[in-house]
UniProtKB/Swiss-Prot annotation:
Source lineage: Viruses, Riboviria, Orthornavirae, Negarnaviricota, Polyploviricotina
Intravirion side of membrane: 1-6
Regulation acting on activity, per entry: Inhibited by the neuraminidase inhibitors zanamivir (Relenza) and oseltamivir (Tamiflu). These drugs interfere with the release of progeny virus from infected cells and are effective against all influenza strains. Resistance to neuraminidase inhibitors is quite rare.
Name of the protein: Neuraminidase
Disulfide bonds: 92-417, 124-129, 184-231, 233-238, 279-292, 281-290, 318-335, 421-447
Length: 470
């Protein structure tokens, strides 16, 4: 074979190899395109995602693609369409209270990253229930937990997490800078109210869906404060009560009507012989009922009810089963303040059923220990101390604290009535437990049911002191 023939042969072989390679590459491209079409052709991109989602440590894996989604809760099988929570249903008939949640946050916080908190409360939308709380800007078992017995500081903030979970940096959502707060959902968005600032010039910041919409300046310059539990939404309007003035004498009390975060009306209560603090409010047949704390001179609880025009009535629970702490032994009640052991108090709640009342209270008369629910069938209007039902929730030997009401609307439960619920704060640490350098709490909650319930104790259960305390 001469040199020219060798060159032609080698060139032909190279060209053949190149053509084969090109054909293989084209086949590879076609196969990838066909495979992609098969995978995506049948998907409806506007519908609900049917992929399997596995959540671990606040991160989401979707088809082996890592996506970090912070503070996002996927509510499976729920229609997320906005609604208007009517709030016009009556309270559900109940026979007792079923345990609903327990977060065990102090126990978990001995080893995990859990916020130092107080004043937890629960509020529900038509899709979910969340625990709100006032953090101290510190974690349990950390040096910044020192001195957190203080109520008001610039480090406190209103945050929220899914109900039943220990509040941590990994599952909690920031809501507002606050040392006093309230929150509620109207079916379309969350309203949050956070009060912060100096005692003589605090300001309440209103947010709707996370955006500042309004502010309220302290009008008496005496520690503006609000409910420390959920506000109430009825037919698109939300209602809250604020107090400004002395904690041991007559103060100023205002009701605010709020729509999408904007104040549309407010009134001041004419109640010179009453004292209203830290009200626990709920809707009932289109009206709002609030049961509050008298820190001035009442060992029974004051109440105020009002309609959507803010026409109101006031009074005190008449029952001789007294609901505040400290309080005297049960006996002769009054529809006015019962002044025996009436000074000081603790946030609490009651539910009215006609002339009857479910009273939530500490088991101890003098300290924040234990908790029980009592059904007094005539206690709203009569002054005797007779009752029919007592359900134990926390034993006398275990610490409790604040308590408050929240409801589950029919839009959430599917019932034709408003389900009454309540939460109890289980305070640990200072000032009572002096082996610690901190003050914090966990929480439990219960909901009313018309079926069997248990008498038991669901205490905080943490073993103190922690490592930081030694």
């Amino acid at each position: 074979m001469n040199p020219n023939q060798k060159i032609i042969t080698i060139g032909s072989i190279c060209m053949a190899i190149g053509i084969i390679s090109l054909i293989l590459q084209m086949g590879n491209i076609i196969s990838i395109w066909v495979s992609h079409s098969i995978q995506t052709g049948s998907q409806n991109h506007t519908g609900i995602c049917n992929q399997r989602i596995i959540t671990y440590e606040n991160s989401t894996w979707v088809n082996q693609t890592y996506v970090n989604i912070n503070n996002t809760n996927v509510v499976a099988g729920k229609d997320t369409t906005s609604v208007t929570l009517a709030g016009n249903s009556s309270l559900c008939p109940i026979r007792g209270w079923a345990i609903y949640s327990k977060d065990n946050s102090i126990r978990i916080g001995s080893k995990g990253d859990v916020f130092v908190i107080r004043e937890p409360f629960i509020s529900c939308s038509h899709l979910e229930c969340r625990t709100f709380f006032l953090t101290q800007g510190a974690l349990l078992n950390d040096k910044h937990s020192n001195g957190t017995v203080k109520d008001r500081s610039p480090y406190r903030a209103l945050m929220s997490c899914p109900i039943g979970e220990a509040p941590s940096p990994y599952n909690s959502r920031f809501e507002s800078v606050a040392w006093s707060a309230s929150a509620c959902h109207d079916g379309m968005g969350w309203l949050t109210i956070g009060i912060s600032g100096p005692d003589d010039g605090a300001v309440a910041v209103l947010k709707y869906n996370g955006i500042i919409t309004e502010t309220i300046k302290s009008w008496r310059k005496r520690i503006l404060r609000t409910q420390e539990s959920e506000c109430v939404c009825v037919n698109g309007s939300c209602f809250t009560i604020m107090t400004d003035g002395p904690s041991n004498g007559p103060a100023s009390y205002r009701i605010f009507k709020i729509e999408k975060g904007k104040i549309t009306k407010s009134i001041e209560l004419d109640a010179p012989n009453s004292h209203y603090e830290e009200c626990s409010c709920y809707p009932d047949t289109g009206t709002v009922m609030c049961v509050c704390r008298d820190n001035w001179h009442g060992s029974n609880r004051p109440w105020v009810s009002f309609n959507q025009n803010l026409d109101y009535q006031i009074g005190y629970i008449c029952s001789g089963v007294f609901g505040d702490n400290p309080r005297p032994k049960d006996g002769k009640g009054s529809c006015d303040p019962v002044t025996v052991d009436g000074a000081d108090g603790v946030k609490g709640f009651s539910y009215r059923y006609g002339n009857g009342v479910w009273i939530g209270r500490t088991k101890s008369n003098s300290s924040r220990k234990g908790f029980e629910m009592i059904w007094d069938p005539n206690g709203w209007t009569d002054t005797d101390s007779n009752f029919l039902v007592k359900q134990d929730v926390v034993a006398m030997t275990d610490w409790s604290g604040y308590s408050g009401s929240f409801v589950q609307h029919p839009e959430l439960t599917g019932l034709d009535c408003m389900r009454p619920c309540f939460w109890v704060e289980l305070i640990r640490g200072r000032p009572r437990e002096k082996t610690t350098i901190w003050t914090s709490g966990s929480s439990i909650s219960f909901c009313g049911v018309n079926s069997d319930t248990a008498n038991w104790s669901w205490p905080d259960g943490a073993e103190l002191p922690f490592t930081i305390d030694k």
